[in-house]
Each structure stands twice: as structure tokens, then as C-alpha cells.
Amino acid sequence: MLASGMLLVALLVCLTVMVLMSVWQQRKSKGKLPPGPTPLPFIGNYLQLNTEQMYNSLMKISERYGPVFTIHLGPRRVVVLCGHDAVREALVDQAEEFSGRGEQATFDWVFKGYGVVFSNGERAKQLRRFSIATLRDFGVGKRGIEERIQEEAGFLIDALRGTGGANIDPTFFLSRTVSNVISSIVFGDRFDYKDKEFLSLLRMMLGIFQFTSTSTGQLYEMFSSVMKHLPGPQQQAFQLLQGLEDFIAKKVEHNQRTLDPNSPRDFIDSFLIRMQEEEKNPNTEFYLKNLVMTTLNLFIGGTETVSTTLRYGFLLLMKHPEVEAKVHEEIDRVIGKNRQPKFEDRAKMPYMEAVIHEIQRFGDVIPMSLARRVKKDTKFRDFFLPKGTEVYPMLGSVLRDPSFFSNPQDFNPQHFLNEKGQFKKSDAFVPFSIGKRNCFGEGLARMELFLFFTTVMQNFRLKSSQSPKDIDVSPKHVGFATIPRNYTMSFLPR
């Protein structure tokens, strides 16, 4: 009896060893994860990271471990990609494998995998296809949306003239303008600039954007499972997100009550009609939760990124008055002072185009991109990334890649001009990301940036309360987003 028991134990031991050897051989044949600092239990590599400067911390680690490395953000294992080559190889050359969406802990509190931006699989595919088609139907990429942007630019010019050249904080002047463009698409109408609810919504969006870029926001990315139950600034961020969700839900309810299926007024109507068409489809992704969350995606994404870029842009132009002077000269020569700028003017304005590109490159609004996730076991270079591995494509490292930009730390529009003064494209210009999950609002954002910058510069000179040499263009926060410092300025009529 004893002998048979020992034989059974021996067989189990042998079987266990064989299984472990088999797993080890498979891992060995597939390869290993990229190198990285050794993590501690639960806290991961927290001790090697500065949450005040997360982007810089990760770039510092890449100096030791190379352009592809593994980091543990608390219990989260993330593979980080640095530089043009690594990011493009992953997001373009292996686009399908890297097209999953990773975690964005603060936003996940409200979105929970719903909506077009933070979803995965068939849901992401269906909602993205629908959103792109519907935005196109409502004029994005066509003359219709250009007229809407021009109209809103006119409201902005009137508001800035109304300041009488006084020193102002431009933050909400710009965010009101940008937000009204996406509002006209998703809600069917613009807000009055004095609308208190509108201003409250803009403050909510700015507050969330800023929180995700602070030290606490980055700490939450690591330890959300614990911090979501604790008091702290994250609870205020949750309240802001909830306030935005409630506002969108209220808008959706209004549209449901007043819907005419034969005459959609806006994005919400179009989604509601699609819901009716698919109500008998058990696998449909067109239901109320995805409508509210997709609308919220568009509202936040269509407001904060462009308005932050404008805010950074005016600061950079005041820092570099020689650039502002050249912009004025080109506008006066190509457009003049009497007619409104058109998007087609862009083709004749290489300097303005270079300036806007350089503002986006230098401003680097989303430096670590939205996290990706590999959809299946993936071989990348000499490494093996198991299915579900999260990936940070460091867009900022591409925008500052010295192989493409001669002085990447400096603001210099020459980065996008050839020796003849003609605009030149760059493969490393990736502020909208690249690949299958790039920003599908890129066309709208490009049109807004050109028309808003050009219209403002046609009508005003920019004046800072500081001399150019004293203007600080380093960011206030760098986390999920890059947040420029608060500043005041005057818009002086030309």
C-alpha cells in the first residue's frame, strides 16, 4: 500500500515537472517580455517613478533598458514603446495585434468599457464605424462643418473684441468656441457663451483633464483598486465625470421624447434611430449605455484637446514674437484683412501650416497616448507579449525624436519647412496617434486649428503682461495630458 502511494506521488511529481517543462519550453520558444526594472509585490516599480513627471520618468528608464521595456505601474504590467521606429512598428506594421484598448483608470470609473473610445472587440469596431459615418453625414470633412467653424470663429472674434484689449485668461474663451463645434454636431445646436450650465460643463472637463495629469492622477493609474475607495482628489474627479454623464443622459432623454426618425437633427438622433433599427438584434451594440458614453467621448475629446492646443499655441507665439510677425505677414498677403479665412487657404500658407504643426509637436497634448492592449499572443521584435498585455505608445517620444527633428526641445516652425520655405510633412508627426485606434476626429481638429488660429491672428496682435524672455512655456502638469501654465494676455485689434 505504501509502495503504491509513493509510486502515485512520484508519478504526480513527474507529471508536474513535465507540465512545467512544457510551459517553460513554450515560453522559451515564443520569447520573453521586454526587459525592465525588477518590480516589488503590489507596488511594482513605484519607487523608480516620479508621478509628478511620469513621462520623463519612463523616458529615463528607456535610457537604460532600450526603446521597448516593461514597467509595473503598481500591479499593472505595461510594455512601453519609445521613439518613432518602435511606435510605428507596433501601431502600423502590427496594427491589428496592437488595436486593443488598455486601461485609463480615471475614465474607466465612468465608461467601464462602454462608448467608442474605451471599448474593445466588436463593440469598438461597430461604434467607431458608426461614429465616423455619422460625423461625415453631419458635415465633418465637408463644406458644412467648415461653415459651422467659421461661424463660431466669428463669435470668438466678437467676444475677444468685447474685452477691449484688457488682460484676460483665454482658457474659457477658447474652450467655449471649440466645444460649440462638437456640440452643434452631437446636440444639434451651439450654446450661448454666457450659458451658466455650459460654463459649468467646461469647468468639469478641464478639471478632469487636469486631474489625470497631476501626481495624484498618475498615482490613481497605479492603485485605482484601492484609491477608488479612499477620500482624495480622485473623488472630486468622479463627481465631475458623473456630472457630465448626467448632462448627456438628460440630452438623450430630450431627444427620445422629440425624435422624428425621418429627420435626424444630430448625432444623438442618428444613434437613437439605429437603436430602433436594431432592437431585435440580440448582439446589437446600439443601446442607451453606449449612446450616452459615445456622446460623452465625443464631447470631452472634441473640446479639451483642441482648446488646450490653442491655449498653448498663443503662449508660444507670445514667447516668439518673430514667429507671430511672420504669421501676420503671410495672412495679410494670402487672405488680406477683410475676408474670412477658408480651409483651402491652407495650401497657400506653408508658414502657418508649419507653425500649427510645431505647436502640436511642442505642446504634445497626449504624450503617452491612450493605452493600447495586444489582442492576442504577439511576437514583437525579439520579445513575446502575452494576449492582454497593456502597451504605452509614447507619442511624445516620437514628436521629439532627434532623427526627425533637429532641435526637438526647441519651438521652431522650421522643423516643418524645407530649404525653399515649403511645408514638409514628417513621419514623426503623430499627435493624433496612428494605426487602427488613431483619433477619428483628426480631420475636424485640423480644420478647427487652422481656422481658429488664422482667424484670431488675422484680427489681433497678442500681448503678454511679461516680456518674451520671461514667459515660461514649460508645462504646468504632464501626465495623461500636457497642461500649459495659467497665463493672462491681451488681444489687441490690428
Swiss-Prot record:
Its main location: endoplasmic reticulum. Liver. Changing residue 418 to D: In allele CYP2A6*28. Induction: By phenobarbital and dexamethasone. It is a peripheral membrane protein. Keywords: Endoplasmic reticulum, Heme, Iron, Lipid metabolism, Membrane, Metal-binding, Microsome, Monooxygenase, NADP, Oxidoreductase. Its EC number is 1.14.14.-. Changing residue 300 to F: Increases phenacetin O-deethylation activity 3 fold. Increases phenacetin O-deethylation activity 8 fold. Increases phenacetin O-deethylation activity 10 fold. Increases phenacetin O-deethylation activity 12 fold. InterPro entries: Cyt_P450, Cyt_P450_CS, Cyt_P450_E_grp-I, Cyt_P450_E_grp-I_CYP2A-like, Cyt_P450_sf, Cytochrome_P450_fam2. GO terms for cellular component: cytoplasm; cytoplasmic microtubule; endoplasmic reticulum membrane; intracellular membrane-bounded organelle. Changing residue 194 to E: In allele CYP2A6*15. It catalyses: 1,4-cineole + reduced [NADPH--hemoprotein reductase] + O2 = 2-exo-hydroxy-1,4-cineole + oxidized [NADPH--hemoprotein reductase] + H2O + H(+). It is found in: Endoplasmic reticulum membrane; Microsome membrane. PANTHER family: CYTOCHROME P450 2A6, CYTOCHROME P450 508A4-RELATED. Belongs to the cytochrome P450 family. Exhibits a high coumarin 7-hydroxylase activity. Can act in the hydroxylation of the anti-cancer drugs cyclophosphamide and ifosphamide. Competent in the metabolic activation of aflatoxin B1. Constitutes the major nicotine C-oxidase. Acts as a 1,4-cineole 2-exo-monooxygenase. Possesses low phenacetin O-deethylation activity. This is Cytochrome P450 2A6. It comes from Homo sapiens.
